[in-house]
């Protein structure tokens, strides 16, 4: 019985010090309108897609804040809450900063600390600047090869659109929404990266692929 109590107390301690649980305590009682304000303010700190503004959950938002700002998630949440004229005090112990994705050359070394947005941003830049790819980026580059074969006509139309308007802001990517949506979007935009520039390609990726879809793809990539 004493042993069970120790286990129970230990679990409660973990729950009370987990950054996700601490941040969630401040979000869980917000009204829908208040949460919408929080989401829009969060866009100053997080990469949100268009669909995230209507579909992101409190749990996903918290996970993204903790992942993007592991050392400052408490400060970021406090700043975000100022949009509601609320002054909150979040006491969270900091941890080591996540390792930049560019340092990882092989899939076996991938960890939870790597951000998919880092991988994609660096990958698009490498493609635009014709920088030799390491094994991890070669794995991602297979999606570009697939896109060339599968979307040759659509890629031509996207290039024509960009050459005419100088951007892809209002261009709808011809990628069907299914379990391959994230990887196909990466591949399609990677082909366009030398033409439109890696920055525009990256922001189109953020605009189109939601945080939830990015997380699902990251788990799939890490499981292989």
Swiss-Prot record:
Belongs to the orthopoxvirus OPG034 family. Keywords: Early protein. The lineage of its organism: Viruses, Varidnaviria, Bamfordvirae, Nucleocytoviricota, Pokkesviricetes. Transmembrane segments: none annotated. This is Protein OPG034. It comes from the Viruses. Pfam families: Poxv_Bcl-2-like. It comes from Vaccinia virus (strain Copenhagen). The keyword Transferase does not apply. The keyword NADP does not apply. Induction: Expressed in the early phase of the viral replicative cycle.
């Amino acid at each position: 019985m004493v042993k069970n109590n120790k286990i129970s107390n230990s679990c409660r301690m973990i729950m009370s010090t987990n950054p996700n649980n601490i941040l969630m305590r401040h979000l869980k009682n917000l009204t829908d309108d208040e949460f919408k304000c929080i989401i829009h303010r969060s866009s100053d700190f997080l990469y949100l897609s268009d669909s995230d503004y209507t579909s992101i959950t409190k749990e996903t938002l918290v996970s993204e804040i903790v992942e993007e700002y592991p050392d400052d998630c408490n400060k970021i949440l406090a700043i975000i809450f100022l949009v509601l004229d609320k002054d909150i005090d979040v006491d969270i112990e900091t941890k080591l900063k996540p390792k930049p994705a560019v340092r990882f050359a092989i899939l076996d070394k991938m960890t939870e600390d790597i951000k998919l947005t880092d991988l994609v941003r660096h990958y698009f830049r490498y493609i635009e600047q014709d920088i030799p790819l390491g094994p991890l980026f070669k794995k991602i580059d297979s999606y570009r090869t697939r896109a060339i074969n599968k979307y040759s006509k659509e890629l031509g139309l996207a290039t024509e659109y960009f050459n005419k308007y100088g951007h892809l802001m209002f261009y709808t990517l011809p990628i069907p929404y299914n379990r391959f949506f994230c990887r196909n979007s990466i591949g399609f935009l990677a082909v366009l990266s030398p033409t439109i520039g890696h920055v525009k390609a990256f922001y189109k990726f953020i605009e189109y692929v939601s945080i939830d879809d990015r997380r699902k793809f990251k788990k799939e990539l890490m499981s292989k």
